[in-house]
């Protein structure tokens, strides 16, 4: 996949209709947005286009709508964006997304003005990458901008289809930043390159482990998936999470790491509990073995130090997935220590979206990282070495 894509700064947008695919898939409670990260992430691109005289048309999906659904309207987003930008963002209420109301709102736009279209998933064709809806979207635009990394792994009308019917398709600042940090970390890292993988399941990360073993100097494994690896090494794991059908795969990966000269770090002690509950008593094991009747819920203190030391020696660190059940106070220290080591490091530190992004922000280390990816599934596919259709579809430099 080529990372050298044209950006909004490579095109003259003055007087042009610019359709921007944003990621406004935000959590709503009673019509109020409860997490504004994604809105804030979109502001630099919107401001640039508006300040340079573009007629700005924003679009996005919200939730899993399968047709018009008043509970999934983007109206609250238009209202909040207006407040954040300090200028009106008109809302084109339109169940067909590109109906008469939307066309009229776009036709009336003056240079620098902004309108937000209704949820693209109000059209069931959106997810089918259907030509007719793609053409409808393209008919509103002279220039198309994709700034939604979170949906770049999906070939939908608003991310891929539309690019077939416009001549100019470029990326916004958010995607440019993702390509710069995630792209260079994976394709051209400053070494030593350390990747940290956590989360519950080996099966979710199989392709990531496979791909990263070709690229990293050190691979660190924590979280629920570590217990399948410990089992593969012959340790007892008590009642810990185990994917029995992945033990052989874990053995293969341990052998592959050895053959490639990659340091594979696994827990050397664990913090365990009798039950999966926030108030279960936390017990630290002597070594990697977990006694019968207990389940691993976090990496132990020796492991925390081992992992933190590996991070301290790195020049590039990519992290995807927590080290333990960080939602439980007693079992959050492993995740906290890894985040702290990354925050204190002068390496390029990239957080690969999803749970790790939530953990890092929750622990207050967000602003100490070089880059926090805005895509969960998209970052994972990126780390797997897959092409992302929404990025492939943009013009190369």
Swiss-Prot record:
One Pfam family named in its UniProt record: PGK
UniProt GO MF annotations: ADP binding; ATP binding; phosphoglycerate kinase activity
Positions contributing to ATP binding: 205, 296, 327, 353-356
Single GO cellular component term: cytosol
Principal subcellular localisation of the protein: cytoplasm
Keywords per UniProt: ATP-binding, Cytoplasm, Glycolysis, Kinase, Nucleotide-binding, Transferase
Subunit structure: Monomer.
Family listed: Belongs to the phosphoglycerate kinase family.
Name by which UniProt lists this protein: Phosphoglycerate kinase
Organism for this UniProt entry: Clostridium acetobutylicum (strain ATCC 824 / DSM 792 / JCM 1419 / IAM 19013 / LMG 5710 / NBRC 13948 / NRRL B-527 / VKM B-1787 / 2291 / W)
Annotated gene: pgk
